[in-house]
Amino acid sequence: MSQSTPDVYEKGRGMDAHNEVMREIRGRNDESHDPTEPTRVWLDEDNTPDGVRESLTIILNTGGCRWARAGGCTMCGYVAESVEGGTVAHENLMTQIEHCLEHEADRADDPAPLIKIYTSGSFLDEREVPAETRDAIAEAFGDRDRMVVESLPDFVDRGKLAAFTDRGLAVDVAVGLETATDRVRHDAVNKYFDFADFEAACAEARAADAGVKAYLLMKPPFLSEPDAVEDMKRSVRRCAGVEGCHTVSMNPCNVQRYTMVEELYHDGGYRPPWLWSIPEVLEATVDADALVVSDPVGHGSDRGPHNCGECDDLVQRAIKDFNLRQDPSVFGEVSCECEDTWDYVMREETAYNQPLVR
C-alpha cells in the first residue's frame, strides 16, 4: 500500500489518530455473518459506455477491506458486514455466486449483460478473493458482456484483469477515490492513497484494455455543504481528465453503523448532504469528458441525503432519470420551497454541522 509521509502522519496524529478511533468504534460490533451467503444481490439497470444495460449487482461477503481492518475510512461501515477472521474459503465464495445466479434466474427473463461485483473492499486483493476464485468467477460470467470489479488502486494489475479480458469481457475497475483532493481524502475520509496512485491504476487498467469507474464521496465529515459541492465539481472534472477513466459515480455520504461519521451524527456534528446538492454538481459537470452519475443511497432518511421530506422522492427520481438519459433538463421539472433554505446554506454556511438550519 502507499505509505503516508511520517512528517505529516506521525503517531497520535492524522491517520494514526483516525485509525485508533475507528478501531475502537468498529470493535463494538459483535454481529456474525454466514460465509456462504452474499451480503446483497439485486437487479437494476446502469448507464455504461455501451449504453443502458440490465445489471446484476453482487456484494460478496469476504473477509472485508484490508484498510478497514487497520481502522479505515471515517464513513465506511461495510466491514461490519464482513465475515470475522479476514478470509472466506474459495468454496464458500463460489456458493455465494451460486446464490446470486439463482436470484437472477428467479427474477429475470434473461441473464444480465452487465455484472458488477463488490466486496466492500478490493476484489483484486487476493487476501479477500484468491486467484482461484477470481478465475472461477471469470469463467462463471464469461458469457456476459461487461464486468465491473471493485478495487483499491494498489491491487489493480493487468495480470489479474486478464482473467476477464482474455474471455472477451469488457472490464471496468471501480475505484473508491472519494475525492481528487489529497488533503480531503487523507484528513476527512482517512484514506491513505494519493490522486497519483489513482492515475497509476488507470494506466495499469488501460494496459489490460480495461476501463476505470471512479467513485466520489459527496460531503465527507468536516466539510461544509458549499465546500463539499465545490470539491465534487473539481473532482469530477479532474477524474474525467485522466485517460482511461470513462465514468464518475458521485455519491452522497450516508450515516453507516460503527463509523466515525455515525459518532459525529449522534453528537450533532454531521448532517448528510442535501439532495439539492446532487443536481447542482451533475448540471455543472454535464459537459465533462466522462459519464457522470449518482446513486443517493438512503435518500430521504435522516441518515441519508435528504431535503425537507416532501420532495425527496421527486428529486431522487430526477437523479435516476438523469443517470440514464444524461439530460439536465429533468432537474428543471422538480421544485420545492426547501430549495430556498438550501440556497441560503450554500451562500452562508461555513461550519460543517450546519448550525444555520438547526
Identify the residue ranges that each predicted region occupies.
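Conserved C-terminal portion of the radical SAM core fold
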Residues: 196-259, 278-296
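Core AdoMet radical
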Residues: 79-100, 104-128, 140-156, 170-198, ...
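Canonical Radical SAM [4Fe-4S] cluster-binding loop centered on the CxxxCxxC motif
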Residues: 33-38, 42-95
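Auxiliary Fe-S-binding modules of radical SAM enzymes
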Residues: 2-31, 37, 240, 253-358
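Well-ordered, non-membrane alpha-helical segments in soluble/globular domains
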Residues: 87-103, 129-137, 196, 228-236, ...
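Active-site-proximal loop/turn and secondary-structure-junction residues that shape catalytic pockets
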Residues: 121-123, 153-155, 179-181, 218-222, ...
